[in-house]
Every structure is written in structure tokens, then in C-alpha cells.
């Protein structure tokens, strides 16, 4: 009892010290210290309640008084119990108010968000501020308000709000993000980089986004230096710099003829010899002078252009190329101009060849860097752009290669891949049109590159399903394969690449129409007569994925001598070809006795299959076990293996910890068929304790 009283006393004294400290913090002038004290007091209250519940399990001192308590001599004095009760009551009231304020703050935040979306940033700031009046430690209100301040150009206030958000949560990545943007706007580039680097430290998963923002900071810093040097050249009276400025002023004059502007733009283009003039073009509003000029703009958007309007358009395209040379900030400004999203794709599909060529040259220049490619993907109409690039397959010259090369480079960017997965159904008609091109009048290398791009895209399951769902796409693949077979020497690369795409499509065999599968299988059976090793391998690859869907095709394949050809594949070696060959043999022997007999005849002592069973490639070994098990149904097959260690080999596979459960299952089935066909193998199995191994394997397979 005395020990319990002593512990209670010590606990009480500790509580008094802690509560006194909390009260002092609650009275602090710093609102964050106040809020922290409130939270700590709530935690303390919960802890005390938990301790009281635990204390209820042990004997406590009976505090019942015989006589009523005496009035304290000093009214200001408070008993310890009353003091704790007061703190408890205050904490509960504060917790209740905090919950109520949280609801109000959330409602005000939503109103602020709605105003922000409308572009009414002042109103958004008002609601965020009102919310902070209800709850001062709500970090999202600080970061949202900082974002609104950035939109209004009030970067210092944005930085202050970001600081407050970090006081609420030192790992608030959103605060560092907005702080970085504010520092960039204030030209504090080193501080901006520190902010973005801090984001990656906190969350390494954001590495890609951080890299992009750091790149933007570097480019902005480089652009500032260019502008400073360009202004110094202008101030020093450099002739070309002054001429550039004067020409821009002349071109901004309204009401002149298109030919006047075309001539001025051509002279201006000649001035764009180095970085100084290109930068001055930017700083003195060159992009808006050209793109927003009433006469020039009208000519750019006209569908049917006369000779003068054509000259003006070409001169503008050449100017844009020159001002973008080695100047990524100019490239950014050009690509982000609102008109460019639809203007550049429309130029590329123009009936005027010179405009087509110049616009293609411009796009090529814009996509030379990673940043340029991402700017194009982010800001241009990618559906129209893809269609425009694919339309260049109509040309047999280098324009087709350039266009598909650009598309391929864009497709390597993660941003493009994300866009493509979402928008593939919209682009599929154009991609199907590319496959429908007549290979004899299309650039073979460009068409091949286009098909390779489709093959890469089809490696992703969702993309494959979209392609298969678009029936015309599969038919276009089949038709193109037929066209290429007419001149295999000329179209060898196209055929080889196309078979790779078809192999990917056949991974979704259940979604393909039976008629298409039959036609494609027949075409690949004929390709097995090719002398080209690459085409042979891929044709076998397609068949390894289609044969199992149709007994008719299996029978046609046997008639075409597929077993003999696959045995030849296996004798030649090569992991990829062997994988396809043994799978085809497994499919054929699984459904056709004639195939089993032919395998037994061509591989009399099963030397090939034994070799594959010993392979470290689990897929090879598993299909070899399946094929061997099928062949055990041929009467003379099992005895031919008596002088081999086939039981030990199969038992090892059946008891292995293979990731491919089919390996264990196929080996177990093969053992069963082997022992059934030849009882002497059953004796070997018992000697090797194989029954226990098989039982254990079957139990494991059933459990998994």
C-alpha cells in the first residue's frame, strides 16, 4: 500500500510539472507554440485516462473522508485533484473547439479551391486566410494560399506561407515545391534548386519530377544570363542587335501587305546569326509580334493560300527555325504559344510541299533535346501531331524517315508513353492507316521503324487489348504480311519487324477472332519455308502462341511437316528458337498421336528431349517434360529409356522449387506415364523414394 502511495505521489508531481509547462506554452505569444501545447495537452489527457483505467485493476488508497472537507484558508489555493480536473475540462473543451474549427476550416478550404479553379485568386486567398483564422496549423491552407500568391506574383508572401507550412510539417513536399517556384520567379536559382533537391530527399519516388523541375531552373537561369548579355550588346550599340530591335518595331506596324511583312521577316531571319540576336528577338516581343499580328496571323491560318501568303508562311517558319537554334527558352516560348498546338500539325499536313518540309524541319529542331521533346508532348495537340507525322509515310524520300524518326524519339519519353496509353484509341485509325500503306511505294526503312514503334507499344497489355479491339488493326497486320511475302528479299526487315508485333498481339490469343488466328497461322506455316533465320524464328514464335487455339491448325501444321522442322530447330540450338520449337512440339503431341509417333521416330533415344530436360531454362525443361510425357503413349517409347537416368532427371524436376509450377506438374505427369508404360521404371521410382517426393510436390501444387 505504501509503495502504491509513493508511486501515485511521484506520478502526481511529474504531472504537475508537465501541466505547468503546458499552461505556460498555452499563454505564449507564438500561435504555433499555443497550438502545439493544445495538442500536447490532448495527448496528456488521453494518457492520464489510460493510466486511470490501468490503475483500476489494482488496490488503491481509500480516500473517503469521515468529516466534510474544510474550506481552504486561502481561496486562491487549489487542491491537486481540482487542478487536474480543471486541466482535463479545459483540454476537452479545446479538443471540442478544435474539431469544430477543423470542420469550418475544411469548408473554407473548399471554397478557396473553387475560387482558385475559377482563376479568382484574391477570393481564394480570402477563404484560405479565413480558414487559417479557424485553424492556424493546417498546412494545406498555407500551401494553397502560397500557390494563389504565386499566381498573383506576390512571391514574398508565398515564401512566408511556405515557411509556415514547414513549421506545421517539416516534410511537406508541397511547401518546398511552391517555395521553389517562388524562388525561380525571384531569380534565387540556387535556393530554388535546394528546395527541389529537398523534395527528393523526403520522397525519392519523386525523383523524375524533381529532375524536370531542376532542369527548368537551369534553363531559366541560362535564359536570364542570355538576356543580360543581349541587353549589354544592345546598350553598347552593336549593329546587329540594334537592327534586330528596329526590325521588330517595323514589323509591328499594322495595315501593310503580306509581301511587306515577308520581306521584313526574311531580313530579320538573316540577323539571327548568334545567341544575342535570338535573345533580343525574345526580349523585345518577337514571338507576339509575329504570331499575334493581324495580317501575319490571318495568312498563317488560311487553308487555301495564294503565292504571296505562301511566301509569308514559309518566311515565318524559317524565322522560327533560326530563333530556336541553341536557344531552349525561345523553343519553350514558341511551343507554349496558344496557336502552336494546332498550327504546327496543320502546316505539316498542308498541300503546299514547301510548307510541309519547313514545318517538319522546325519540329525536328524542337525535338532534338529531352526538354524540347517534353515541351512538344506537353503543349501541342499530340493526336493531330501523330496523324501528321504518320501522313509522311506517303512519301518515299527522306521526309518519311525524318517524320517517323521524330515520332520514335517522342515515344521514348515517359510523358509520351503516359499520354499514348490514355489516347491510343484515338490514334489507332492513323496507325492502322500506316500499316495499310503499299510497301512498294513507301520508304521501307520508315515503315519498318513505324512497325517497330508499334511493337514496342504492344508490349504493354492494355495497349495490346486496344489494338486487338480495333479489328481493322489486326487485319492490316495480316494484309501487310501478305504483301511483303510477294518480295521477301525487298521487304525482309518489314516482315521480321511485323512478326514481332504480331507475336505480341498473340499474347492475347483469347481476344483474337478464330478466323484471324487461322489465317495468321497458315501464313506463318508458309514462312517456315523461308531461308532467313530471323523470320523462321519469329514465324515459329507466332505459331507457338496460336496453335493451341485450333485443332484444325494443328492438323494443318502436321501436314506441313512442322514436327520435322521443329526437331531441326532444336538440333540447331539457340535458346529463343528452342523455346518456340519445344512449345510447338508440346502442343502437337498433346493433341495428336501422329505427332507423338513422329517425335519418337525422329528423336529415337530422346537425346534432344533429355538435353532439354537438363536445361537451366525452366520453360524449356517444362515443355520438354510435357512433350516426353505425351510421347510415352507410343508403345515402343518407354523401353528405349531404360538405360538412361530419366527417372532421376524427372524426379529432380518434380521436386524442384521452380518458380514455374508447370515444370513440376509436367515432370510429375511424365513420371506417371513413364511408370505406367514400363513397370520397371516404377521400381526405380520406389528405390529413389520418388513416391514421397511426388506426393509432397502434388500437395505443394494444390496448396499454391
Curated annotation (Swiss-Prot):
InterPro entries reported in the protein's UniProt record: ARM-like, ARM-type_fold, TPR-like_helical_dom_sf, TPR_2, TPR_rpt, TTC12
Subcellular location(s) per record: Cytoplasm
Cited function: Cytoplasmic protein that plays a role in the proper assembly of dynein arm complexes in motile cilia in both respiratory cells and sperm flagella.
PROSITE patterns membership: TPR, TPR_REGION
Database matches in PANTHER family: TETRATRICOPEPTIDE REPEAT PROTEIN 12
Modification Phosphothreonine occurs at: 71
Superkingdom as given in the UniProt entry: Eukaryota
Gene Ontology biological-process annotations: axonemal dynein complex assembly; sperm axoneme assembly
Protein name: Tetratricopeptide repeat protein 12
GO CC terms, sorted: centrosome; cytoplasm; cytosol; nuclear membrane; plasma membrane
Species in which this protein is naturally found: Mus musculus (Mouse)
Primary subcellular site in the record, as a coarse category: cytoplasm
Gene3D superfamilies, A to Z: Leucine-rich Repeat Variant, Tetratricopeptide repeat domain
Pfam families linked to this entry: TPR_1, TPR_2
Keywords: Cilium biogenesis/degradation, Cytoplasm, Phosphoprotein, Repeat, TPR repeat
Family matches, as SUPFAM superfamilies: ARM repeat (SSF48371), TPR-like (SSF48452)
TPR repeat segments: 105-138, 139-172, 173-206
Amino acid at each position: 500500500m505504501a509503495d502504491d502511495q509513493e508511486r501515485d505521489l511521484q506520478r502526481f508531481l511529474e504531472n504537475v510539472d508537465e501541466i505547468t509547462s503546458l499552461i505556460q506554452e498555452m499563454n505564449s505569444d507564438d500561435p504555433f507554440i499555443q497550438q502545439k501545447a493544445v495538442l500536447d495537452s490532448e495527448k496528456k489527457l488521453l494518457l492520464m485516462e489510460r493510466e486511470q483505467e490501468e490503475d483500476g485493476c489494482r488496490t488503491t488508497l481509500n480516500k473517503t473522508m469521515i468529516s466534510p472537507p474544510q474550506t481552504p484558508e486561502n481561496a486562491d489555493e487549489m487542491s491537486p485533484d481540482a487542478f487536474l480536473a480543471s486541466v482535463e475540462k479545459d483540454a476537452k473543451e479545446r479538443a471540442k473547439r478544435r474539431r469544430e474549427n477543423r470542420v469550418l476550416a475544411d469548408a473554407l478550404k473548399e471554397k478557396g479551391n473553387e475560387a482558385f479553379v475559377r482563376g479568382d485568386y484574391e477570393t481564394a486567398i480570402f477563404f484560405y486566410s479565413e480558414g487559417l483564422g479557424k485553424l492556424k496549423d493546417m498546412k494545406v491552407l498555407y500551401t494553397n494560399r502560397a500557390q494563389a500568391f504565386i499566381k498573383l506574383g506576390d512571391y514574398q508572401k508565398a515564401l512566408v506561407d511556405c515557411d509556415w507550412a514547414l513549421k506545421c510539417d517539416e516534410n511537406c513536399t508541397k511547401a518546398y515545391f511552391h517555395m521553389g517556384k517562388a524562388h525561380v520567379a525571384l531569380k534565387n536559382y540556387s535556393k530554388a534548386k535546394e528546395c527541389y533537391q529537398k523534395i527528393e530527399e523526403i520522397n525519392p519516388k519523386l525523383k523524375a519530377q524533381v529532375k524536370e523541375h531542376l532542369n527548368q531552373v537551369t534553363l531559366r537561369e541560362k535564359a536570364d544570363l542570355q538576356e543580360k548579355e543581349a541587353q549589354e550588346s544592345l546598350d553598347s550599340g552593336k549593329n546587329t542587335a540594334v537592327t534586330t530591335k528596329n526590325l521588330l518595331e517595323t514589323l509591328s506596324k499594322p495595315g501593310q501587305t503580306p509581301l511587306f511583312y515577308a520581306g521584313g521577316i526574311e531580313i530579320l531571319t538573316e540577323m539571327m546569326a548568334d545567341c544575342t540576336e535570338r535573345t533580343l528577338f525574345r526580349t523585345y516581343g518577337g514571338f507576339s509580334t509575329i504570331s499575334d499580328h493581324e495580317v501575319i496571323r490571318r495568312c498563317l491560318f488560311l487553308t487555301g493560300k495564294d503565292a504571296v501568303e505562301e511566301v509569308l508562311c514559309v518566311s515565318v517558319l524559317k524565322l522560327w527555325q533560326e530563333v530556336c537554334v541553341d536557344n531552349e527558352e525561345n523553343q519553350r516560348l514558341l511551343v507554349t504559344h496558344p496557336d502552336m498546338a494546332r498550327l504546327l500539325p496543320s502546316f505539316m499536313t498542308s498541300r503546299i510541299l514547301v510548307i510541309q518540309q519547313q514545318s517538319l524541319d522546325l519540329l525536328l529542331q524542337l525535338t532534338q533535346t529531352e526538354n524540347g521533346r517534353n515541351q512538344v508532348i506537353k503543349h501541342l495537340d499530340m493526336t493531330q501531331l501523330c496523324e501528321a507525322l504518320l501522313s509522311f509515310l506517303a512519301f518515299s524520300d527522306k521526309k518519311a524517315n525524318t517524320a517517323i524518326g521524330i515520332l520514335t524519339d517522342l515515344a521514348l519519353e515517359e510523358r509520351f508513353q503516359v499520354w499514348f496509353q490514355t489516347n491510343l484509341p484515338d490514334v489507332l485509325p492513323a496507325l492502322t492507316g500506316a500499316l495499310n500503306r503499299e510497301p512498294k511505294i513507301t520508304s521501307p526503312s520508315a515503315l519498318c521503324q513505324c512497325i517497330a514503334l508499334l511493337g514496342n507499344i504492344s508490349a504493354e497489355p492494355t495497349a495490346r487489348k486496344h489494338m486487338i479491339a480495333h479489328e481493322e488493326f489486326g487485319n492490316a497486320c495480316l494484309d501487310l504480311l501478305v504483301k511483303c511475302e510477294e518480295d521477301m528479299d525487298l521487304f525482309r526487315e518489314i516482315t521480321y519487324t511485323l512478326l514481332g508485333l504480331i507475336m505480341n498481339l498473340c499474347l492475347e490469343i483469347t481476344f483474337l477472332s478464330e478466323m484471324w488466328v487461322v489465317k495468321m497461322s497458315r501464313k506463318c506455316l508458309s514462312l517456315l519455308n523461308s531461308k532467313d533465320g530471323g523470320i523462321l524464328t519469329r514465324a515459329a514464335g507466332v505459331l507457338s502462341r496460336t496453335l493451341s487455339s485450333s485443332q484444325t491448325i494443328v492438323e494443318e501444321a502436321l501436314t506441313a511437316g512442322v514436327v520435322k522442322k521443329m526437331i531441326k530447330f532444336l538440333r540447331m540450338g539457340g535458346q529463343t528458337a528452342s523455346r518456340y520449337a519445344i512449345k510447338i512440339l508440346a502442343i502437337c503431341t498433346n493433341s495428336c498421336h501422329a505427332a507423338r509417333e513422329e517425335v519418337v521416330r525422329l528423336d529415337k533415344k530422346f537425346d534432344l528431349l533429355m538435353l532439354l530436360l537438363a536445361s537451366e531454362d525452366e520453360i524449356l525443361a517444362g515443355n520438354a517434360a510435357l512433350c516426353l510425357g505425351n510421347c510415352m503413349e507410343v508403345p515402343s517409347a518407354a523401353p528405349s529409356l531404360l538405360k538412361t537416368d530419366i527417372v532421376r532427371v524427372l524426379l529432380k524436376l518434380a521436386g524442384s522449387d521452380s518458380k514455374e509450377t508447370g515444370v513440376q506438374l509436367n515432370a510429375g505427369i511424365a513420371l506417371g506415364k513413364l511408370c505406367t508404360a514400363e513397370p520397371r521404371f516404377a521400381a526405380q521410382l520406389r528405390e529413389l523414394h520418388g513416391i514421397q517426393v511426388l506426393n509432397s510436390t502434388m500437395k505443394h501444387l494444390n496448396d499454391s
